[in-house]
């Protein structure tokens, strides 16, 4: 079986979860099963719940992981909703979310993620109603400007939005190739990534509501307060990493009083656990040589302890 995607930070993921023995492991973003396959092999007494919103990826992984079918339950779901759907929440001992786009999605012409694609789609869940085509051809100039500024951190967001609106007034923009030509190949000052790449990334975030989905997922975890559970999140965008970092910092605090208050009044017992990774873990030099797409990957991990704080 040809594997269409190389899992990032595979060794680092295995290291984070190496001490897990029994219970349930939740792979929120199964993709093509690389992380789960390695963990299933190394943890024979763990049971797995494997979720993905991409039907193609899910079907592939069912075949790839068929030897472990007695230990794994598959589910099609966006990872922001999965915690509301699964059983065995009390028995969760590990949770992994790799929230990047797979190589298969990027390289598949029909999915419309790549700047070279003949399509303009970018939906991770192909059943979603809104695609990149609708956003590019129906959003107002102000809406497009906001997307490019907030999600792409592009200094000339207004100019890019203006160019798109001008071109679509002549004919609808139907392909990623066409959009790429409109945006241009230049780079932002002091940034290595091209303007078009940042703009495409911003559109993809809007199509899939990626930042909202991440915040919803972390919010559900905060409410769930799993016990004796390790959470690892791999992100590929600075905005996503910032959100994860902020949540982990908040969860690790005992005192939640206003910083201006001189004396603690909250009980000083609100910590949900400890941050495992002092700094985000990045790909090694060896991995970068094998898989250049791992260059943006950052992993952070948190341990939910077994204390009932309230």
UniProtKB/Swiss-Prot annotation:
Enzyme class, broadest EC rank: transferase
Q: Is Methyltransferase included in the keywords of this UniProt record?
A: yes
Cross-referenced SUPFAM superfamilies: Putative methyltransferase TM0872, insert domain (SSF81799), S-adenosyl-L-methionine-dependent methyltransferases (SSF53335)
Protein biosynthesis found in the keyword field: no
Query: According to its UniProt record, which protein family does this protein belong to?
Result: Belongs to the methyltransferase superfamily. RsmH family.
What main location does UniProt list?
Answer: cytoplasm
Enzymatic reactions:
cytidine(1402) in 16S rRNA + S-adenosyl-L-methionine = N(4)-methylcytidine(1402) in 16S rRNA + S-adenosyl-L-homocysteine + H(+)
Q: What does this protein do?
A: Specifically methylates the N4 position of cytidine in position 1402 (C1402) of 16S rRNA.
E.C. designation(s): 2.1.1.199
Offer one Pfam family short name for this entry: Methyltransf_5
Q: Which residues are involved in binding S-adenosyl-L-methionine?
A: 33-35, 52, 79, 98, 105
Q: What is this protein called?
A: Ribosomal RNA small subunit methyltransferase H
Q: Which domain of life is it from?
A: Bacteria
Example of a GO biological process term = rRNA base methylation
Q: Which GO terms describe its cellular component?
A: cytoplasm
Which terms are listed as keywords in the entry? Answer: Cytoplasm, Methyltransferase, rRNA processing, S-adenosyl-L-methionine, Transferase
Q: From the UniProt record, which GO molecular function terms apply?
A: rRNA (cytosine-N4-)-methyltransferase activity
Range of residues in the leader sequence: none
Q: Where in the cell is it found?
A: Cytoplasm
